[in-house]
Amino acid sequence: GTSPKGLARDVLEAVIGALTDVQPAALSASEVADAVGTSRVTARRYLQYLADEGRVARAQRLGGSGRPEVTFAWRR
């Protein structure tokens, strides 16, 4: 298939790889960004796309700072 508009296929595959490597655990956008070597904003755009496609499950992780962090987990 073709990669979605504005998303690079290699980055998309790296994001998917980061999530499948840790499944069933979930990662935050910043953790995915670190794993892939992109900015958090970029990682979030790819994660959002995968969530919209139903390939990734979104959840919230309660952080120590009190503000919940959105996490993403690969849906098998």
Describe the function of each predicted region.
Residues G17-P24:
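Short, locally clustered residues in the helix-turn-helix/winged-helix DNA-binding domain
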